[in-house]
Amino acid sequence: GFNFLDVGGENYDKNMSGRFYELADEMRLVHEHLPRAFLAAVLFLPLPASRDKGKRSSFAHMVVELRERTNPADPSLPRVPGKCDMGWVALYAEGDEPEGFPRGVVRFFNAARDCPRSGRPKVLETESLSEMAAAIVEAARRQIKPNYVAS
């Protein structure tokens, strides 16, 4: 999912509720047909979303909301069909940020972690695409392995 600057130009979380309703519907539908499927959600925000508001940025709001819609990592706990198994918020550079990042640079933040209330996370607190993919695969292996029964 993507979120853009609202019409008033103040923040990036204007239609966040709609994105999460869509996410829950997708998760529920897939889990209904494939109950053991491991589903990861990735929501994209431009880098200015990390500093668009004073108290809590749109990025921080997105991380907290996505965390609440993610199943616990413990495979012994029951999974909720309308939740994803892992959530990530991607921050991407549009190319005109004061930090000077080139257009298209993307870093992925695991929603299970705490993030700054305002401002971007440190690069070391984020993952590249390949690091995120490896983390998703590893989490899926941990989730599926205890429940796998060979026939």
Where are these regions (language model features)?
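Conserved catalytic cores of phosphodiester-cleaving nucleases, focusing on short active-site segments
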Residues: 1-6, 23
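Short acidic/His/Gly/Ser-rich catalytic and metal-binding motifs that mark active-site loops
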Residues: 6-9, 99-101
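C-terminal tail/extension regions appended to the core domain(s) of diverse proteins
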Residues: 51, 59-151
